[in-house]
């Protein structure tokens, strides 16, 4: 029965493999797995059940139980020979952030509450954010990807110039960068890793939402490696709790009016955010905490208490507010989901 023991060992790592049975699949003469007792008018079936390691879940057409048939094939009553898969769990941090806690002046993430947060460094050493959305893909902003590159640069030009870390400074290699086809309006790009990351309590994707969580007053959390009070990049991941703002007030703050012919693009920080139907704003907390340079690419994470799941309601695009301007600007995740899923499926 050594072959079955090998299956269990491999499954503990969240991987599923065909069973190598040797010359005699029916030979149970093994001290570690004695032959089961016989019963009158009955027989013994040889069964295996596939399970996944912690932070993975089984995706199967059947129940994950396979029986050895007369042809020495492991078969499931629904899926036949097709094996199930272990897929990464998303949005289920082992140590979620305390809802009562309150990056310019944010709190330190000491317990890994934001395992989807990645740190990206440009070829000239500038730190930005990225968000893990599967065990092989991340979202970030197009502006982050274009840092120190011309506007005509392609994803192939950009990918080799980036350094990317997940978890506690785990270096990962980038296979490709894919920019949104309308990235001047939808400030987003995708990063594909060369290898899938092992999902742990420190490295876990956040879920993309199927419904819109964005509503004025709704609170989300944003983590990041951006600049702090003294305008230096932090070496500790920080987070802040921010409310979704009234969109019209945000537009007036940056553009002086919601009426197109009356707009005056005079941002209080000297840089204009991209504001359109694909974006939403989040305001300062009462403690005047805010995001800042280097936090872009991070998720506006919202906890769905009914599902006990964390979703990326948006991706931070405009991180220049730094407690000077009143609002950070985010790309709506619901507007990205179709493009993200199609792009991942094709690549």
From Swiss-Prot:
Q: In which tissues is it expressed?
A: Expressed by the liver and secreted in plasma.
- Record's keyword terms, sorted: Acute phase, Antibiotic, Antimicrobial, Antioxidant, Disulfide bond, Glycoprotein, Hemoglobin-binding, Immunity, Secreted, Serine protease homolog, Signal, Sushi
User: What processes in GO biological process is this protein linked to?
Assistant: acute-phase response; defense response to bacterium; immune system process
Q: Which residues form the Sushi domain?
A: 31-88
Gene Ontology terms: cellular component: blood microparticle
InterPro entries recorded: Haptoglobin, Peptidase_S1_PA, Peptidase_S1_PA_chymotrypsin, Peptidase_S1A, Sushi/SCR/CCP_sf, Sushi_SCR_CCP_dom, Trypsin_dom
Disulfide connectivity? 52-86, 90-207, 250-281, 292-322
Q: Enumerate the subcellular locations listed in this protein's record, separating them with semicolons.
A: Secreted
Q: Which SMART domains match?
A: Tryp_SPc
Q: Which GO terms describe its molecular function?
A: antioxidant activity; hemoglobin binding
Q: Where is the Peptidase S1 domain?
A: 103-345
Question: PANTHER family under this entry?
Answer: COMPLEMENT COMPONENT 1, S SUBCOMPONENT-RELATED, HAPTOGLOBIN-RELATED PROTEIN
Purpose of the protein: As a result of hemolysis, hemoglobin is found to accumulate in the kidney and is secreted in the urine. Haptoglobin captures, and combines with free plasma hemoglobin to allow hepatic recycling of heme iron and to prevent kidney damage. Haptoglobin also acts as an antioxidant, has antibacterial activity and plays a role in modulating many aspects of the acute phase response. Hemoglobin/haptoglobin complexes are rapidly cleared by the macrophage CD163 scavenger receptor expressed on the surface of liver Kupfer cells through an endocytic lysosomal degradation pathway.
Q: What is known of its domains?
A: The beta chain mediates most of the interactions with both subunits of hemoglobin, while the alpha chain forms the homodimeric interface.
Name the family the entry cites. Belongs to the peptidase S1 family.
Q: What is this protein called?
A: Haptoglobin
């Amino acid at each position: 029965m050594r072959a079955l023991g090998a299956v269990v060992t491999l499954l503990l790592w969240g991987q599923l493999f065909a069973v190598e049975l040797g010359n005699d699949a029916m030979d149970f003469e093994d001290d570690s797995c004695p032959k089961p007792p016989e019963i009158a008018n009955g027989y013994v079936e040889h069964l295996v059940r596939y399970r996944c390691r912690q932070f993975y879940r089984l995706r199967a057409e059947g129940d994950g139980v396979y029986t050895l048939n007369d042809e020495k094939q492991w078969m499931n009553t629904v899926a036949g020979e097709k094996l199930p898969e272990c897929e990464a769990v998303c949005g289920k941090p082992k140590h979620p952030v305390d809802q009562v806690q309150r990056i310019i002046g944010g709190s330190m993430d000491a317990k890994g509450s934001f395992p989807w947060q990645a740190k990206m460094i440009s070829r000239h050493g500038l730190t930005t954010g990225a968000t893990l959305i599967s065990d092989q893909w991340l979202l970030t902003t197009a502006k982050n990807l274009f840092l120190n590159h011309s506007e005509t640069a392609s994803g192939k030009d950009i990918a080799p110039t980036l350094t990317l870390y997940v978890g506690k400074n785990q270096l990962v290699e980038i296979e490709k960068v894919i920019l949104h086809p309308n990235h001047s309006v939808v400030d987003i790009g995708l990063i594909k890793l060369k290898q899938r990351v092992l999902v742990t309590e420190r490295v876990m994707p956040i879920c993309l939402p199927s419904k819109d969580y964005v509503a004025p007053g709704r609170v989300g959390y944003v983590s990041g490696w951006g600049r702090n009070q003294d305008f230096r990049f932090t070496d500790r991941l920080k987070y802040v709790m921010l409310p979704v703002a009234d969109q019209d007030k945000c537009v007036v703050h940056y553009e002086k009016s919601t009426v197109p012919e009356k707009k005056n693009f005079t941002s209080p920080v000297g840089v204009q955010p991209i504001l359109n139907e694909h974006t939403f704003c989040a305001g300062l907390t009462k403690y005047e905490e805010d995001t800042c340079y280097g936090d872009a690419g991070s998720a506006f994470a919202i906890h769905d208490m009914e599902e006990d799941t964390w979703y990326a309601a948006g991706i931070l695009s405009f991180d220049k507010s730094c407690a000077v301007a009143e609002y950070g600007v985010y790309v709506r995740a619901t507007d990205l989901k179709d493009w993200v899923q199609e792009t991942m499926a094709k690549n």
